[in-house]
Amino acid sequence: FLLFITLFTAAFWRNTPFFLVPFGAAVVLFSRPRDVPIVTADKIAAEQKKGLLFRPVDFILSVLLLGAIAFTVLRGFVVLDCPLDACFNYIYQYEPYLKDPVGFPRVMMLMYLFYAVPLMVALIYGLNFPGCGWMLDWTIFFAGAMAQAQWCHIGASLHSRTPFTYRVPTDKWWPVISLNVLLAAVPSLLALRCLTSPAYFMKPVPKGQTSEDKKMK
């Protein structure tokens, strides 16, 4: 028992920095002044007048986010033991790791279901309605969170110490890994889109004035 307590304490303190650093990074990210690029009011107005169908990149990202939501909801239902045939087929034919008794995959899928899904809905809203300046920050935050979470999930499902019966079936390896990598990549692609062309998400400024002029006043 004393050995268990000693090992638990050592493991706890070794992992504490990895638990605290993301909170510190989030505080720094959301508290620092945003570096607003110089964009004219005319360009902002022109971008914000375009409908979703006239912004093909945003349209594709919206479709990908909808697919990610559907995939996340499916896996959430799977770990909640939903009796649907789709859930049964998925857990036994594609990702048996989700029923690993250690509980880690179940917790991950529930976190996705209750935290990632609402945020993805908000991001779809931001892609459809102009002036959502929070997209410039939250997309970066979400991209980092999903990349880390998916790295852990994919790595654990393929790890040699995971019982063989819970690993991804050989014949389903490519579709399962591709879907999981895509789930990690979509938020990063969205963050890159917001970073490289932020005009659609910026608040309108008086005509003829740049966003930099507004910031300086």
Model-derived segments and their meaning:
Residues 1-78, 110-217:
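Eukaryotic polytopic
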Residues 69-100:
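Hydrophobic transmembrane helix segments
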Residues 95-115:
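Interfacial helix-start motif at the membrane-water boundary
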